């Protein structure tokens, strides 16, 4: 229903553009023929304005109310530029292009999922456990993984979440995850789990599997944009920011997150464990477990401006210290395991740290994040996991 309304709105806006162009030509011709008597011409002009206004507002309201991809940015640009002659036409054409592409893209996805519904290509032998990264939580109504879990479930996946705190040391987060794994296996009798972990969650998961006795409950561990070798820029920042400032920020964060459900958040411990020096120590002791399949997914932005705030600001800093990156984690640091996947798209866009968890619910030309995870999980199924 939403896509149909959005598509109808785009069609009305296209009709508006074409009919407006033809109406201008018509009014010019009739004005020339009726000169100097403009009485009839005024009637024609009023009729055109009324009809075009009806078509335009009918279309733009439908698009504004149903498009998910326009976002605040293009809605604001559309409103602001609506009062600027000629510029408003370019803005309107951009709005039509974005909304039309969304309609076509989502309609094709619906058709694909419908055709393969009976195949259950994501029905893995063992359920999926999603593990979030630092400074986020698993909220019921605001999914950390965006539209990805719903897409996987439609294709047969059984999904659980880590439900651990937003910020803690790798050791403490690992303990929470180990407890969660035992809980899921004990309650469901599923035997094992396939972990998919993002960012610091990958370090937490590696520690839990290697050090906390849950290796027999884990079939595979897929890390996504995880800084396995740390972030050198984090070492630099921690060395430059005064201790008083670090403690002030940590106190404010810890206090705020307790109100959101964290029992014992530790901002500084979480940040310290992301440094290159800490990750080196981790890698010396946290070894891969034979019998557990390890793989990684990494991505990179192509230019800083293609990342959403704050990744567009952090990208140059990370690039200076660590090389090509996703806005936070370098591609060299994200690789781990038997299968190392590196992602980007052509042009200036690239794929950011947030894009790989569908943080902004944005459709990216050349990369379908939901389908990527469908194929990733399908691969786990085909491997017997």
State the predicted function of each range.
Residues 120-192:
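Active-site catalytic motif of lipid deacylating hydrolases and related acyltransferases
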Residues 129, 160, 220-222, 295-297, ...:
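Hydrophobic/aromatic beta-strand patches that form the interior of the parallel beta-sheet core
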Residues 145-148, 211-214, 238-241, 313, ...:
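Glycine-rich, phosphate-binding/catalytic loops in enzymes
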Residues 134, 165, 227, 298-300, ...:
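Catalytic metal-binding/acid-base residues of hydrolase active sites
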Residues 41-46, 74-80, 288-385:
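C-terminal catalytic-base region of ester-bond hydrolases, centering on the histidine
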Residues 1-141, 385:
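Flexible, membrane-associating and regulatory peripheral segments of lipid-active enzymes
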Residues 132, 159, 175-282, 326:
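Serine-dependent carboxylesterase/thioesterase catalytic core
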Residues 142-143, 231-237, 305-310:
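Short aromatic-enriched loop/helix-cap "lid" or pocket-rim segments at secondary-structure transitions
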């Amino acid at each position: 229903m939403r896509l149909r309304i959005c598509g109808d709105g785009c069609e009305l806006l296209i009709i508006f553009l074409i009919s407006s162009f033809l109406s201008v030509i018509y009014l010019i011709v009739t004005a020339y023929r009726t000169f100097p008597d403009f009485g009839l011409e005024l009637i024609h002009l009023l009729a055109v304005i009324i009809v075009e206004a009806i078509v335009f507002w009918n279309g733009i309201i439908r698009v504004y109310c149903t498009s998910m991809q326009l976002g605040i940015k293009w809605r604001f640009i559309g409103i602001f530029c609506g009062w600027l002659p000629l510029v408003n036409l370019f803005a309107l054409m951009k709005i039509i292009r974005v909304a039309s592409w969304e309609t076509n893209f989502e309609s094709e996805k619906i058709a694909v999922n419908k055709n393969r519904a009976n195949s259950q290509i994501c029905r893995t032998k063992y359920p999926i456990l999603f593990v979030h990264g630092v400074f986020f939580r698993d909220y019921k109504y605001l999914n950390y993984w965006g539209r990805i879990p719903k897409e996987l479930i439609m294709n047969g996946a059984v999904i659980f979440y880590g439900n651990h705190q937003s910020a803690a040391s790798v050791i403490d987060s690992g303990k929470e995850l180990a407890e969660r794994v035992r809980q899921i296996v004990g309650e469901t009798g599923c035997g094992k789990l396939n972990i998919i972990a993002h960012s610091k969650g990958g370090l937490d998961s590696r520690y839990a599997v290697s050090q906390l006795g849950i290796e027999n409950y884990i079939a595979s561990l897929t890390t996504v944009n995880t800084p396995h070798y740390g972030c050198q820029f984090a070492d630099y920042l921690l060395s430059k920011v005064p201790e008083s400032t670090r403690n002030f920020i940590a106190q404010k964060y810890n206090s705020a997150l307790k109100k959101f459900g964290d029992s014992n958040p530790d901002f500084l411990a979480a940040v310290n464990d992301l440094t290159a020096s800490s990750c080196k120590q981790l890698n010396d002791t946290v070894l891969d477990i034979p019998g557990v399949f390890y793989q990684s997914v990494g991505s990179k932005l192509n230019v800083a401006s293609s990342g959403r705030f704050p990744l567009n600001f952090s990208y140059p800093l990370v690039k200076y210290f660590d090389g090509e990156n996703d806005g936070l984690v370098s591609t060299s640091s994200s690789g781990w395991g038997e299968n190392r996947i590196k992602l980007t798209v052509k042009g200036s866009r690239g794929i950011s740290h947030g894009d790989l968890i569908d943080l902004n619910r944005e459709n990216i030309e050349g990369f379908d994040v939901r389908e990527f995870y469908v194929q990733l999980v399908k691969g786990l199924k085909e491997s017997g996991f």
